[in-house]
Amino acid sequence: MFARRLLCSAMIAAGLAAAAHADARDLMVVGFGGGFQDNARKHLFQGYTRANGAAVKDDVYNGEMAKIVAMVKARDVTWDVVMVEAPELVRGCEDGTFEKLDWNVINRSKFVGGGTVACGAGAVGWGVTLFYDQKRIADGPKNYAELWDTKKFPGKRSFRYTPKTTLEIALMADGVPFHDVYKVLATKAGQDRAFTALDRIKGDIVWWRSGAQPLQFVASGEVAYAVGFVGRTARAAGEGAAYPLLWPTLLYSFDYWAVVKGSPNTAEAMKLINYMTEPAPLLALAQDWAVSPATKAVADDPAVRARNPGMVANHAEVGLSISTEFWVEYGEDLEKRFNAWAAR
């Protein structure tokens, strides 16, 4: 009897150990790709491994929440830390897609104002602006109203395939001042106005879904004008491309690091986020890539600011801050309407 119990206990222990081993995996960080992630891999992900011994892998997505929601509902979470835009973060925090962050592990005091929310720690500031190739077009549109003038400025235009930023741009093109955009867009009449404005140039629109595409489209001549990520445009300009940074067309926000609800690596993920938002690794990253960090000591560093002409914080006063509150409230309905409109 004793031997049988001993054998049974050993089998249970072995089974538990095997299950634990099956559940154990490397940390998985998922971001938006591009030059930032290439350099984050070296300085943040691999830096964490060097400092703490935990292996970190990374992958890329385009911001779609459906996959994250599905893995949470299925309780089969294969992503641990994700870079998320602000409205999606807040909605995901409210509906249980993301974990509340542990501020005993993550030092909340190191961030700029607005750099943290319950489920997110600020990663980087980002923005989009209008640009074009001055080697092909010496004098292009300087604002969104001019971008809508297809007679004066013929050619294809490229926008990100999303209602966020696209609807704001449409209203500004239609004459709505920056400071009134969200007041107007919060009304049915304002939403109709934005889609009507888009109707006027729909035949000239080429949509992009990854951050590299607008640069590729403009470089190849497939489109004449594009609204693309500031960091990528500034980087291309620094490497010799004749792309102007038209700051009066700036729309900007923060991306955040979040932990997927149900991650088996939740505790380690909190430590990773704290590391990735520390000044030292971010300053090292800034040596290789122009960043707009949400960590105050880095954002305020004169050398970082001088090295990054595309730092959105330097130009926020002339741009439009993308309203997280607006997109949390109206985003789901406008996404459905936008997708239906684009498919027609």
Labelled PLM ranges:
Residues 316-344:
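Conserved C-terminal helix/tail region of periplasmic/extracytoplasmic solute-binding proteins
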Residues 260-319:
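Mature extracytoplasmic/periplasmic domains
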Residues 108-111, 126-128, 191-192, 196-200, ...:
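Periplasmic-binding protein-like
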Residues 23-92:
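Early extracytoplasmic/lumenal segment of secretory-pathway proteins
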Residues 129-136, 171-173, 254-268, 284, ...:
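A bilobed periplasmic-binding-protein/Venus flytrap-type ligand-binding module shared by bacterial periplasmic
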